[in-house]
UniProtKB/Swiss-Prot annotation:
Residues 372-410, 552-585 are annotated as: Disordered. A zinc finger (UBP-type) spans 277-377. Residues 572-585 have a biased composition (Basic residues). InterPro entries: BRAP2/ETP1_RRM, ETP1_RRM, RING-H2_BRAP2, Znf_RING, Znf_RING/FYVE/PHD, Znf_UBP. GO terms for molecular function: nuclear localization sequence binding; ubiquitin binding; ubiquitin protein ligase activity; zinc ion binding. This is RING finger protein ETP1. A zinc finger (RING-type) spans 240-280. It comes from Saccharomyces cerevisiae (strain ATCC 204508 / S288c) (Baker's yeast). The keyword Zinc-finger applies. Its main location: cytoplasm. Residues 400-410 have a biased composition (Basic and acidic residues).
Length: 585
């Protein structure tokens, strides 16, 4: 947050008082500082002061006696000295504005700290809006400025627009998320519409800048339409008309109402009245008169254009002529079943379903039943206009239901009649609003059901068509699949036969191969046996030929032939054969 500096200026009636005050301030200890002391432009010394702030000026100083060498220690002494007769002004160092050409289009870019509440109903007072709806915490801690604008454009209705400038962008974002779409009250279906202000574009200055030598500059500068400033200048802080304290948007929130008077937010909250504390401007009275004037000029039947015996539908606002004319109001009921209609001239409410008047029905506090109020009291006429709350109910309810009147006298009589029976009228307003709300919800539910039924029927028809198409596609696909299945089955049978033949051949060949392997093995064994026998026979013949002439000892000897280690079994078998041969000999 930026740090600001303030300047105190003392304005006196003559030069002697200025010099005297200056000498007094020079003698003050360094603890007390005065930024500037001077004489403002005064036409004459004997000029009559026109400012309510003019008074006798005195300065209080604290004298320290603790450093004195006295036995008894004295406390600090507060002394006062008269300066003169004048005004104390408090200035704030602010940034100077850049000179702009009024003929050119000016664009003031936003900094995401400004939001706007659109279409605030006219029955909301400033106190209700700030204190009850927005809340004291937001008003006192987050908001720097409020500005309330009234809409008087034809066709847009009579309502208010509230500009709110926050101290930082995060608070503005949180405010928009919390209040956008929030209902203004339980009995009013209207909701709060909060938008962010991106920039402000205008062709001329919104307010005329005050001259540098004027005593009361207008609100320092307008926080909603002034760019960021660069040069520092002195600007006097204005005072709040309610509490007479200085108004600074950096320390407390400020609110500007439609009559362009500015106050502290907490001061206006304490002023529980719809009128301005300065000029007594009442937004409710002006909006009501404007609404009645606009409605009286444009009241006519929506079908035939008749201006006599008009009835307005309380459900949708349709205006039609009565049963003594072309009966367009009754036809509207027969077409839409909107059973409540109000006579624009007398403000009486007729129930087409019950075929009777219901504008005098209130809710009994004992058992909650609807009872009819009879008779009229003779209350004092001085009660008219004394209660802002009743004016809010009467005028706000009439402006909301779009009533139309051509005579101010009849309007006054109607208002007097409402205020004579204030309790009954409050009950009537609550009951009527609740009944209308239930009617609105009922018919909205019926319309939603009708739309849902129509959409469901169209969806069913489309689903039926798609179902038929899918059935045809399924039948075609099923036939193709059956053909493919038969072909695949025949092919599968052929393949199975081939596989069975191949498997039989494979088994036969396997058996034949095993038989051949066994025969081959037997032949190998017989071959080896025959080879050994031939070898033994050849050895026997050779040895017999060699040893035929030898001695008996040599003939009876044994011949050993060394064989490899791996052929042990073969040698054993050979020995057995040799023994067998010898035994045979």
């Amino acid at each position: 947050m930026d740090q600001f500096e303030y300047i105190i200026t003392l304005e006196f009636g003559n030069q002697n008082q200025v010099e005297s005050a200056y000498q007094i301030f020079k003698s003050i200890p360094k603890k007390l500082k005065a930024k500037s002391i001077g004489e403002e432009s005064i036409k004459s010394n004997n000029q009559d002061w026109q400012d309510w702030r003019v008074c006798d000026l005195e300065i209080d100083m604290i004298t320290d006696f603790k450093n004195q060498t006295s036995k008894e220690e004295e406390s600090d002494l507060i002394t006062s000295q008269y300066l003169g007769h004048g005004i104390i002004r408090l200035f704030k160092l602010s940034n100077a504005n850049n000179t702009l050409n009024e003929k050119e289009i000016l664009t003031i870019p936003g900094d995401d700290t400004m939001i706007c509440i659109l279409f605030v109903p006219t029955y909301f007072t400033v106190h209700d809006l700030l204190h009850f709806y927005i809340g004291d915490d937001i008003v006192n801690k987050q908001v720097s400025n409020f500005r309330i604008l009234r809409n008087q454009q034809k066709g847009m209705g009579f309502n208010f627009t509230v500009l709110i400038k926050f101290r930082n962008a995060l608070d503005a974002k949180n405010f928009k998320e919390e209040f956008n779409g929030k209902s203004f009250s339980r009995m009013d279906p209207e909701t709060c519409h909060v938008i962010s202000v991106k920039e402000i574009v205008f062709q001329k200055k919104l307010f005329q800048r005050p001259a540098a030598n004027e005593d009361f500059p207008y609100l320092l500068t307008d926080p909603f339409t002034v760019k960021k400033k660069k040069e520092l200048v002195k600007v006097e802080l204005p005072t709040c008309p309610v509490c007479l304290e200085r108004m600074d948007s950096e320390t407390t929130g400020l609110v500007t109402i439609p009559c362009q008077h500015t106050f502290h937010c907490q001061c206006l909250n304490k002023w529980k009245n719809s009128r301005c504390p300065v000029c007594r401007h009442s937004s409710l009275r002006l909006s009501r008169e404007s609404l009645l004037k606009q409605a009286g000029d444009s009241a006519h039947c929506a079908t035939c254009g008749s201006t006599d015996n008009l009835w307005i539908c309380l459900i949708c606002g349709n205006v039609g002529c009565g049963r003594y004319n072309s009966k367009h109001a009754i036809k509207h009921y027969e077409e839409t079943l909107h059973c409540f209609a109000m006579d624009i001239r007398t403000q009486r409410v007729w129930d087409y379903a019950g075929d009777n008047y219901v504008h005098r029905l209130v809710q009994n506090e004992v058992d909650g039943k609807l009872v009819e109020v009879g008779g009229s009291g003779d209350d004092d006429n001085n009660d008219i206009g004394n209660s802002d709350e009743l004016q809010n109910v009467v005028y706000g309810n009439r402006s909301k239901n779009g009533e139309k009147s051509n005579s101010n006298k009849k309007d006054g009589e109607l208002a007097a009649n409402f205020l004579r029976h204030r309790e009954y009228h409050l009950e009537y307003v609550q009951v009527l609003i609740s009944q209308l709300e239930s009617q609105r919800e009922y018919y909205e539910l019926k319309l939603q059901e009708k739309d849902q039924t129509a959409s469901d029927s169209s969806n069913v028809e489309s689903l039926k068509k798609s179902m038929e198409d899918l059935k045809l596609q399924f039948q075609v696909t099923q036939k193709e699949w059956q053909k493919r299945e038969m072909a695949q089955k025949s092919k599968l049978e052929e393949d199975m036969l081939v596989i069975e033949g191949l498997q039989a051949n494979l088994d036969h060949l396997s058996k034949k191969q095993e038989q051949l392997e066994r025969e081959n093995k037997a032949l190998e064994e017989s071959k080896q046996d025959l080879e050994e026998q031939v070898k033994d026979l050849m050895f026997y013949l050779d040895s017999q030929e060699k040893f035929k002439d030898a001695d008996e000892s040599v003939k009876e000897g044994t011949i050993l032939i060394q064989q490899p280690h791996g052929a042990a079994q073969a040698s054993k078998s050979k020995k057995k054969r040799n023994k067998n041969k010898k035994a045979g000999k």
